[in-house]
Amino acid sequence: MIALSALLTKYTIGIMSNLSNGNSNNNNQQQQQQQQGQNPQQPAQNEGGAGAEFVAPPPGLGAAVGVAAMQQRNRLLQQQQQQHHHHQNPAAEGSGLERGSCLLRYASQNSLDESSQKHVQRPNGKERGTVGQYSNEQHTARSFDAMNEMRKQKQLCDVILVADDVEIHAHRMVLASCSPYFYAMFTSFEESRQARITLQSVDARALELLIDYVYTATVEVNEDNVQVLLTAANLLQLTDVRDACCDFLQTQLDASNCLGIREFADIHACVELLNYAETYIEQHFNEVIQFDEFLNLSHEQVISLIGNDRISVPNEERVYECVIAWLRYDVPMREQFTSLLMEHVRLPFLSKEYITQRVDKEILLEGNIVCKNLIIEALTYHLLPTETKSARTVPRKPVGMPKILLVIGGQAPKAIRSVEWYDLREEKWYQAAEMPNRRCRSGLSVLGDKVYAVGGFNGSLRVRTVDVYDPATDQWANCSNMEARRSTLGVAVLNGCIYAVGGFDGTTGLSSAEMYDPKTDIWRFIASMSTRRSSVGVGVVHGLLYAVGGYDGFTRQCLSSVERYNPDTDTWVNVAEMSSRRSGAGVGVLNNILYAVGGHDGPMVRRSVEAYDCETNSWRSVADMSYCRRNAGVVAHDGLLYVVGGDDGTSNLASVEVYCPDSDSWRILPALMTIGRSYAGVCMIDKPMUMEEQGALARQAASLAIALLDDENSQAEGTMEGAIGGAIYGNLAPAGGAAAAAAPAAPAQAPQPNHPHYENIYAPIGQPSNNNNNSGSNSNQAAAIANANAPANAEEIQQQQQPAPTEPNANNNPQPPTAAAPAPSQQQQQQQAQPQQPQRILPMNNYRNDLYDRSAAGGVCSAYDVPRAVRSGLGYRRNFRIDMQNGNRCGSGLRCTPLYTNSRSNCQRQRSFDDTESTDGYNLPYAGAGTMRYENIYEQIRDEPLYRTSAANRVPLYTRLDVLGHGIGRIERHLSSSCGNIDHYNLGGHYAVLGHSHFGTVGHIRLNANGSGVAAPGVAGTGTCNVPNCQGYMTAAGSTVPVEYANVKVPVKNSASSFFSCLHGENSQSMTNIYKTSGTAAAMAAHNSPLTPNVSMERASRSASAGAAGSAAAAVEEHSAADSIPSSSNINANRTTGAIPKVKTANKPAKESGGSSTAASPILDKTTSTGSGKSVTLAKKTSTAAARSSSSGDTNGNGTLNRISKSSLQWLLVNKWLPLWIGQGPDCKVIDFNFMFSRDCVSCDTASVASQMSNPYGTPRLSGLPQDMVRFQSSCAGACAAAGAASTIRRDANASARPLHSTLSRLRNGEKRNPNRVAGNYQYEDPSYENVHVQWQNGFEFGRSRDYDPNSTYHQQRPLLQRARSESPTFSNQQRRLQRQGAQAQQQSQQPKPPGSPDPYKNYKLNADNNTFKPKPIAADELEGAVGGAVAEIALPEVDIEVVDPVSLSDNETETTSSQNNLPSTTNSNNLNEHND
């Protein structure tokens, strides 16, 4: 190598020298030729030949040296050419070389074209010679992927690693580059010369995972492999994997395994994990000693543990008892260590009684002289504590438990039940168990390990109840009530008792105060203050109680005075006044200094802060807060003062400010509360175990890069592309356009546009679809509609209101980014992006509900509906609230027998709320099995005879409902509901979801025809039908029409033709008024048939039950509908809509209506009379408006928005259904609108009727079966099981041997003969299946599993999900509350509230006293795109309403007049009048 390099260098130098000489000679020759006048075109004769001669390579170098020399020569010649190409052409003028050589030289450089000879601008704009750097970020990943594939194929592998007889092929270079262990092995040790290397003490499974990580940078860490994986990673020096295992172990740390994890970390030198485990043991010592790991420790480890000064124990008795328990675990072997252990127990801190009665009489200590001396020392310490000194008399200094900031209830803008807590270490907010009742303006205090929420306002009444929260169990209870009703009161803890001071009782401000003794559970009055004080702040300094500021309802003035209470004398005295009047000020005590924060003086909201020194009896000003705040919560911790929420006079705040007295400065916490709230209770408590686990689960979910967002008013997105989801967890593409970039790719699925798969039931309605790039479908158009018509947040709608005045310079500060008011920068960005209509831009997140999961992995687990067991703590527990009569579908398929011979599932279908096969509605003739019978909660759809059995041949008029939505929860969280049948079409980019109250009622909406087919001319099914539902009847072979339907031309209801519900009374009339017609005259005529529920005799008779006026209204509508049937030529222009509310529009010329109609029909004015005699105009719409709607939409009438508008749905929800729900009893609290849509249905199939009938479940799309869900009431398990067994015996032989289960509230315990069926067929209803809220407190939280996953393979398991804020309280809590309150709970039902978070249907105000609502006007341009330009202006109906300010309303600051007098409500400008309930 050295000789070759030297020869090559010498040869290259010779070439360079020759070229240099040749160049010099060439220049001289050219000059001579020019001087002699020779023709430059003639070649030179032997000039410069010596310099131009090619130097031959030395012998022996071969072709390689020759090639290298030629390349070097060509580079030098190119440099010469570049020096002269600007002023001469060597090819033309000659350069001592032949023209052929010159050309060959250029050819070798690929530069024969003219562009290479000139300095021209390159197409990409870069100059020649520009120095740039190219970087390909995917190069490394692609290279490693290629090497990994070669490794799997055993290509170019040069080493074989062996562990436990398992061989793994790999590349030395790759392993050495990632692991210092392999680098040293392959470079310096004997293994560098071995092709097969055996690794000792390395688990084969762990080695495979680590080798995969080296090539892919991905490794899966779970409970099964973390131990062997960490050991192997530590040995192979893969520190990243070792750290990942340590992080995982931190998330799994609890009292049962912390000792083992600490020892494991110590063995493998995982310092961070070791410190974390030791800190955890110190903080949770009292829980750790209760598990077996402690009993299995060695005596040295026990001594190290109990000798630690930092362990946190309630008393020294616990230390003594754990030592005795350890000795008793193995007395023969451990008795010898008794004296050593007892020397580290600090017996002097035990009580004298405990020493004499327990310690001195312990058998294990008898006869032990050392222990007797220790007992004597302890008794001596009690007699002479100052003279007894030893290591055992030094008190312990336990490490501080991690603290959390607990925020309870509040006003947002009405009283809420939400509870959330802030982890000071993680700087994140989490949700806790909600309060059993709505509560705001209450007092909050911490007494012992319990949190007390005292008094307050529940949205309608001032209360005197007290709710008690146990952080250890995350549950609420109650204690004895106060003597007086109080809201906006002050609460503090003094001498182990709770003091409630002042407040407002609904009539006047209070000066009284009372005290609660937890030992006796009794409230009693104490001395009253000298002044009435509501919105008062209290604090305790040096054992004295201070009442600061407030509002005096008698003088109607905000107060600056302060009173002090002495519990020893039971007296109040006045102290120094503040410099400013403050009502609603937050009060906190920090370092024995009393701070009064914010507040207001009439309309002026303050941000100033004052500090009171009780030693000098004086107030002083400190630094102002960043924002003006009143009614904020204040708490002190670790030398800092925390101010939480409040309002600034305009909106509620979600930010938290922290004051540091050392620097006299404020800062804002980086994380905001989930919602802005004022009048909230705030306290600081130790972080309990359950919340520690919740935080660990959240951290684990974050480590999986899954962003979670709980939208309080989340709904299923209505866009088609958002509805089509993936088949397995790998594609968590949620509806509503939630981004699935963070989730693994799913197997390719063919789009099923006619069979939407709703992967997500919690997607926010305001979030547009993310799949805007799909081609070949209407996805782009649908997505554009969804984005254009996405409703703006309530806080994004710029409302014209006068902001409250604030202190000087307060308005100059930017407002905090709260949940109720976005930051100005955000508003400006939104206005720039969409100047005409604000858009709601949300991050793309993955949503998922474990309780109703549609992510099927195939196989026997393909349609797993509900978790049968949940993982909680150390193992799996059976979910007693969800207990099916049959086996688990995700278990072994052998134990499940197919219900149908052609079913694609091995397990039978579980009973479901979403089961769309009705017993009363469907008796499908099934080959080989006779009449099939199905379960369905809609077993009696009383308003729709078409869904019932038609005749003896049992051919159903409707095969199935298209899509069903169902859920349970609270109406105040969602204004659109469940059990609504919604076809696969959207309404302004979003579904219009309506429902009912589950009191024996069923409702659904059917919108948007699928085509423009005409009605069938006959009854035999010979005509065409454009509705999927009519296939089962129209073309059924050999089907006949029942006699009762003989006069009906089309015995099938067009899916765009009806909007009905079987809600009774007044609500049924509102259903009638939203009756919609299709786009054909024949179809409209069909709707006048008795089968049409909106004008049927059945509906008319039931409507009459609401009163004579209701019947008259129904009759008027039927008559109006009959009279308004236009001709087929102008049917699209004059179809009846009955829109609610009335629509005003100016008449347009005929040419502007698209030529659809030139004749203006009379205006249709419908009026419904209520029982009170009030007449409310429900709908009014001109024919011109209808023509405009028709011309702008689909001429065939298949545009949903041409028939029903969002304003109509909104009006119905707010003014009809919501009061109905509010008027019901407390059972309404289990109405949740978590929308659950059926994946598949027979009527959606495009297959033939024969194929539909052959498979009762329809054509399976994704997993073999539609998804189901069931909720089971276990309290009736025994009786229901007996009923089911009995019903099985009495079944017909041809029928399926399964009892029927109805979950409607109207349950019947006995059997009922069905007269429409064959003799012997009975209907049985199992009351065990009800509308109950399923809940497992620790593992199955609020309708969804906290950590449940059916997949046994870890990489297929879905990420953990936190509880959604939109869900209801636990069923168990509700049951306990009902049992505790008894009949009183039925009488004192709580008023639901409007959603706290933005919702498109939320633009209204509620008067909870008389259940009236007043929608706010909606600008016409907001609905322009939604209704196709048909709406120009909306005048919402006038209703009685009490003026309510959602922000500034205070117990003692508003006075209103009764709405019964029909007088306008008034509000004092200064907000200082007494408020009467």
From Swiss-Prot:
Pfam families in the record: BACK, BTB, Kelch_1
Positions with biased composition (Polar residues): 1125-1137
Principal location class: cytoplasm
Cellular component GO terms, alphabetical: Cul3-RING ubiquitin ligase complex; cytoplasm; cytoskeleton; female germline ring canal; female germline ring canal inner rim; germline ring canal
Ranges of biased composition (kind: Low complexity): 20-46, 763-813, 820-839, 1166-1192, 1374-1391, 1456-1477
Kelch repeats: 404-449, 450-496, 498-543, 545-592, 594-639, 641-687
GO MF annotation terms: actin binding; ubiquitin-like ligase-substrate adaptor activity
Location of the BTB domain: 157-223
Function of the molecule: Component of ring canals that regulates the flow of cytoplasm between cells. May be involved in the regulation of cytoplasm flow from nurse cells to the oocyte during oogenesis. Binds actin.
Protein name (record): Ring canal kelch protein
The keyword Repeat is assigned to this record: yes
Keyword Cell membrane: no
Record organism: Drosophila melanogaster
GO terms for biological process, alphabetical: actin cytoskeleton organization; cellularization; female germline ring canal formation; follicle cell of egg chamber migration; oocyte karyosome formation; oogenesis; ovarian fusome organization; ovarian nurse cell to oocyte transport
PANTHER family: KELCH PROTEIN, RING CANAL KELCH PROTEIN
Tissues in which the protein is found: Both proteins are expressed in ovaries, male testis, ovariectomized females, cuticle, salivary gland and imaginal disks. Kelch short protein is the predominant form and is also expressed in fat bodies. On entry into metamorphosis levels of full-length protein increase in testis and imaginal disks.
Key words, A-Z: Actin-binding, Cytoplasm, Cytoskeleton, Developmental protein, Differentiation, Kelch repeat, Oogenesis, Phosphoprotein, Repeat, Selenocysteine
Region (Disordered) location: 19-62, 76-96, 108-137, 744-841, 1119-1200, 1291-1326, 1359-1416, 1446-1477
Compartment annotation: Cytoplasm, Cytoskeleton
Lineage start: Eukaryota, Metazoa, Ecdysozoa, Arthropoda, Hexapoda
Residues bearing the modification Phosphoserine: S108, S111
